[in-house]
Amino acid sequence: MWQNIQGHDTIVERFRRAFGRGRLAGSFLFTGAPGVGKRRFAFALAMGLLCKKQDDLNPCGVCDSCKLFGGKDATEFDFEGSAFVSPHPDLYYISKPPDKSFLPMELLVGDKEHRGRAGLCYNISRTPFLQNGKVAIINDADFFNAEGANALLKTLEEPPPDAVLILIGTSTAKQLPTIRSRCQIVRFSPLSPEVLSAILVEKGIALSTAQGEKWAIQAEGSLDQAKELADGDVDSLRTELTKHLTASHWDAVAIAAKLNGLVEALGKDAPLRRRRLRLIFGLAVDHFRNEMQSADSRRAARRLERTLDALEHVDRNVNLPYVIEAWSVALGKGH
């Protein structure tokens, strides 16, 4: 399984050393940009921890536990946001539902009727089914509110024996202090252009090394972003966006309508719509960074800052039409 974790060799060795010395922490916070492999790493770690042989965190691939993950043929996990269902009875996974702004407390401690008798905190405290520990993965840790964080505190402070909790977010700055201070922080760097290009070619996403390198550089180390760039209509989208961004007259209403149409064309899939808008704003960021080399660098810097703010709102689950309208109006000022 570890051979499929590319670009994070140092972190793999760090965990192996800690495990070999019996000093593995009970709570971790994985941080890094979306698409650099944090979640894939977390599942590989879970497979190694739950393996019955536990050989230097290398899953054997043949024990009862490893077979639940796919055995020796396990390469990566088929998950997509909150729709993912854990393949293992001692592995628990939760993430923010697409229609929620925060991680619901019910996922952590159960609803009001079952409070304290359901949810991740309760499940991880129970006796392991396969007698080899438990692992809990909390995706979207950026979206804890105070209520959810308080529900998790006791479990973070006193993890059950043989249990490991892994929280996944994008940066420590987005974590509540009560969460951040109780976890060992593991920072994931963006994938290098060489590593990301090789992955794109290996997966058949890029048809050549040159094409893979081009997308890898534009994606800034994110596999998710590179996949979006590989979409057949990205070049036309970039051309269309550049035409509007360089126009002498900025029509905020028309721009907002255009962007809303591009997002709504993807249907009701909220994560997909959010990724599309993130891609559009990412292309705008690239444009403004290049524009800053021109004479009017101050205006480009202002527009870049407003676009980065819009990206932040997309990641914070703000209503997309509102984000689009606010961005188009903001860019229209001083055009």
Residue ranges and their predicted role:
Residues 1-48, 54-56, 68, 161-164, ...:
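Charged, glycine-rich active-site and insertion segments that engage polyanionic ligands
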Residues 2-147:
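Clamp-loader machinery-focused feature within the broader ASCE/P-loop NTPase space
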Residues 85-87, 159, 179:
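Short, structurally constrained coil/turn elements
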Residues 112, 116, 133, 144-148, ...:
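Short, well-structured alpha-helical patches and their helix-loop capping segments
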Residues 122, 154, 181:
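Conserved adenine-binding aromatic site and its adjacent loop/helix in ATP-hydrolyzing domains
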Residues 131-135, 160-166:
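Loop/turn-to-beta-strand initiation segments
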Residues 150-164:
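Conserved catalytic/switch belt of AAA+ P-loop NTPases
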